[in-house]
């Protein structure tokens, strides 16, 4: 017999200061929140240089505020409920714990409601701790955690990303430089 296993993922996005900022914004938005973040390839942790984060943060939050959530049979909705009560409880628990930590700040979303379905707002957590729970553990929901790093620390961030989670499914590198992409590829390949 043959077995193909799909295992866990804590998929990353690593951005370099020279990246296409609009492309990064779209990738974060769609990568983290399509299918309510309940896909194995969902972008759930991002390492973004401070100059880039300062430039895209408000626009990203604005775009997320426009996401329409509701019934899955209404195809005008971008997001719908998460799969079940267990998932709802797990995801909302991560959000609540992030809200209580000094190193984490929920900058958009963070709300949830299970009165009719299991709805969780698309949520971004900004953290100053690259090993915070929401950066390293698989949440499997509409939660993106962003670690903002000093623009000069790209090499160190590659090491953080590589060592930051036991999962190794997919990841994305954003840079306009082939040299930086190759450097990231070499550091992050499994």
Give the residues covered by each predicted segment.
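ALDH superfamily catalytic-core signature
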Residues: 1-130, 151-163, 179, 187-188
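Short, solvent-exposed loop/beta-turn-alpha elements that line the ligand-binding surface or hinge
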Residues: 135
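Short, surface-exposed loop/turn microsegments at beta-strand edges and helix-strand junctions
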Residues: 138-139
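Glycine-rich nucleotide-phosphate-binding loops and adjacent flexible coil segments
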Residues: 142
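Active-site donor-binding acidic/aromatic loop of nucleotide-activated sugar
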Residues: 145-147
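Short active-site oxyanion
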Residues: 168-171
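Cofactor-binding loop segments of dinucleotide-utilizing enzymes, especially the Rossmann-like FAD-
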Residues: 176
């Amino acid at each position: 017999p043959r077995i193909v296993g799909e295992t866990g993922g804590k998929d990353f996005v690593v951005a370099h200061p020279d990246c296409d900022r609009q492309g990064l914004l779209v990738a974060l938005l769609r990568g983290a929140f399509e299918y309510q973040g309940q896909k194995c390839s969902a972008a759930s942790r991002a390492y973004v240089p401070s100059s880039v984060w300062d430039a895209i943060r408000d626009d990203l939050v604005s775009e997320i505020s426009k996401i329409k959530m509701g019934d899955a049979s209404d195809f005008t909705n971008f997001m719908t409920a998460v799969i079940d009560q267990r998932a709802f409880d797990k995801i909302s628990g991560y959000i609540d714990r992030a809200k209580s930590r000094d190193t984490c700040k929920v900058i958009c979303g963070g709300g949830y409601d299970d009165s009719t379905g299991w709805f969780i707002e698309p949520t971004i957590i900004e953290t100053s701790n690259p090993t915070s729970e929401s950066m390293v553990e698989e949440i499997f929901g509409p939660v993106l955690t962003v670690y903002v790093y000093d623009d000069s620390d790209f090499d160190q961030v590659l090491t953080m990303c590589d060592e930051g989670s036991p999962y190794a499914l997919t990841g994305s590198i954003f840079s306009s430089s082939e040299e930086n992409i190759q450097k990231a590829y070499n550091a992050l390949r499994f």
